């Protein structure tokens, strides 16, 4: 190939690479990334659909809805791995009112939901966590991981819409008082 041909082809190749990357950049700008499929359990389409769902929920409730799969929990239990992931990736202190991380851990063979902020303090009790996991459990057993995450997200929304559990409170250590949430029930 002559030098003149290489000079013409190099800029053309650079421009074509820019256009090839444009859809990816546009997709990333359309919302936050909430789906992290490290175990490769989801198709690209399933990841996109779940990410859209999580972004809609994040916008509606001002909370994070993080979906995580892993096949290497780095020697940690699923709860610790999920909590570390949530914190290390900036979800804990991003200005939202809390959130949840849903993990399918193929290393420990476990499904877990961990919550933070208002999601934990106000809406999602231990019993409700069990209900959320139960909502997706059969789908996980069947290998229908996207359906499992969707069911768990929907169960979470149902609990948020049900409101605060009657009798739920927090303790303010600074003033030594309990704050009981008015459920209106």
Residue ranges and their predicted role:
Residues 22-24:
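Transmembrane signal-anchor/signal-peptide helices with a preference for the extracytoplasmic
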């Amino acid at each position: 190939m002559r030098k003149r041909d290489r000079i013409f082809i190099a800029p053309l190749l650079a421009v074509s690479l820019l256009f090839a990357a444009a859809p990816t950049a546009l997709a990333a700008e359309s919302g936050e990334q909430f789906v992290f499929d490290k175990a490769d359990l989801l198709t690209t389409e399933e990841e996109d659909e779940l990410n859209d769902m999580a972004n809609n929920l994040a916008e509606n409730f001002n909370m994070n809805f993080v979906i995580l799969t892993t096949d290497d929990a780095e020697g940690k239990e699923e709860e610790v791995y999920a909590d570390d992931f949530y914190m290390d990736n900036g979800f804990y202190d991003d200005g939202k009112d809390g959130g949840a991380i849903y993990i399918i851990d193929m290393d420990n063979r476990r499904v877990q939901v961990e919550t933070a902020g208002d999601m934990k303090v106000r809406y999602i009790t231990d019993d409700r966590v069990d209900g959320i996991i139960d909502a997706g459990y059969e789908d996980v057993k069947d290998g229908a991981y996207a359906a499992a995450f969707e069911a768990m997200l929907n169960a979470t929304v149902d609990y948020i819409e049900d409101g605060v559990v009657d009798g739920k409170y927090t303790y303010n250590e600074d003033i030594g008082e309990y704050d009981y949430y008015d459920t209106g029930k």
